[in-house]
Structures are given as C-alpha cells and as structure tokens.
Amino acid sequence: NEKDGIATVIHSGLILSIIIELILLLAYFFFIDDILAILTLEPDVYYIAKYYMLALIIGLSGGLLTFPLRSLTDTVAGTAVSMKIYLLALPINAFLNYCFIYGNFGAPKLGGIGAGVATAITYYILLFIFITIIINNPQFKNLALFNFKFSLKSIKEYLGIGIPNGMGIFMEASLFGFIIIFISKFG
C-alpha cells in the first residue's frame, strides 16, 4: 500500500531505460563494424546484419521503456494484463515481419533488415499499449505518475537488482540476434 513510492520507482526505471538505450546506441556506432569484420561476412550479409542490428537497437528503447511499465501493471493490476499484451506481440511481430521482409501491404521490401524493423515497431506498439492502459485504467489514477519524481536511492536500488537480471535478459535476447549473424556465413 505504499502508493507514494510507486511513481518514483517508475520514473527511475524510465530514466535508466533511456540511459541504457543511449549507451547501446553509442556502442553500436563505435563497435558494430569491428564486430562484423571479425565474422568475415560477405558484403551483402554484412550490410543486412549491420542494419538489422541497428533496427533492433533503435527498437530496444521501446522495449526498455516497457519494462518499468510492465512492472507497474503487474504490481497494480495483476500479471494478466501484461501477459495479454505480450501474447499480442507474437501475431503483431509475425504480421510486421511479413510486411517488411517481403514488402507487403505497402511496406518497403527490406529482406532480413525488415525483420529488425518489424521487431522494433512491435516494441513500440507494446509500449503504446502499456501507456494507453496506464492512462485509461482507473487503478492507476491515484499514483501521481505524471508528477516527476527523481530519487538517486531508487536508481541505486534498481541497479542493484536490475544489473544481474538485465545481464541475464540481455544474454538471452542477444543470443538470438547473434546466432542469426553467425549462421549467416553458411548461407
């Protein structure tokens, strides 16, 4: 029943999400060419891998911003809300992959890069759904979520819990992206 602290924790999570996204974008721009050069890919595959990863990194900000909002909905409204939202992600992503990989329904035909674009758009759609639910659900009205509150203590707590969890999630999620790059040299 500590509703006063919820806004501070959510704001801290959103701030950290933005900081992490900026770090990942910088890392991408400084290191992606070196990482891909190690793999000795064919020029076409190199190009696709580079821009596929860029699309994922850009989309990741939507995913990162979703994490604190998901925690909020899980805490206040129960886990069924976020479960339903994430179940929507699969058909949305499949449809967007179909559109952007093959150029259907007016989308540009992007091939492998289209898969990254589709995933990025899916992350932002999920973010939009979470924001819409939080704004329109009466359970969230009394939490003062739009009164910005910053707390260094809250950020330290986030990092203490979040770094180990985040490393695990990052390793799991990036594994799939890197597997695609590694097997690409086999055709």
Label the model's feature ranges.
Residues 112, 116-119, 131-172:
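Interhelical loop/hinge segments that connect adjacent transmembrane helices in multipass membrane
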Residues 80, 90-128:
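Membrane-interface helix-loop junctions in multi-pass transport and translocation proteins
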Residues 62-86:
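Membrane-interface junctions at transmembrane-helix termini in multi-pass inner-membrane proteins
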Residues 1-16, 77-80:
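Transmembrane-helix boundary and interhelical linker motifs in polytopic inner-membrane proteins
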Residues 3, 75-76, 80, 106-109, ...:
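Helix-loop interface residues and adjacent transmembrane-helix termini in multi-pass membrane transporters
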Residues 36-43, 101-110, 170-187:
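Helix-terminus/linker motif at the lipid-water interface of multi-pass membrane proteins
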Residues 12-38:
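Alpha-helical transmembrane segments of multi-pass membrane transport and lipid-handling proteins
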Residues 30, 43-69:
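Alpha-helical transmembrane segments of multi-pass membrane proteins
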